[in-house]
Amino acid sequence: MHLNAAAGWIHLGDYDSANDELEKIRAEWRAHPDVLDLRWFIYSHHEQWDACLDITSAIVKMAPDRVSGWVHKAISLRRANGGGFENAKALLLEAAKLFPEDGMIQYNLACYCAQLGQLDAAQEYLHKSYELGDARQIKLIALDDEDLKPLWDGG
């Protein structure tokens, strides 16, 4: 009940109410990956990247088969103290071996490579994400993604 309510509040953009709902969950369930996943959305909204990294590290450890855990961990690692694009890319390269058919990982690798100035690799990862996902939708998202701007600027 509280988990669904928290997800609803997040969908509506009310992160404080979402957090209030998560606090109502019994203590023994608060470390469940589903709860932690929602907690990540709240903390990422508030740009608490070190805490986000702790959360996603726990998710990946408990549920290594969750692609979103790996992607969110890379996003957190990119922004956390001592993180950065290189570390986030390295993590996603590891995840890509586990999930070779996941377009979200390929897309994020494209973003990190673009930011690192590795434009040929970025283009390859982006095309791979088109092949694995909804190419039309991904292209629309990619055109507005600041991380991919180096590709559109002619690199």
Regions from the PLM with identified roles:
Residues 1-34, 38-45:
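Alpha-helical segment of the N-proximal tetratricopeptide repeat
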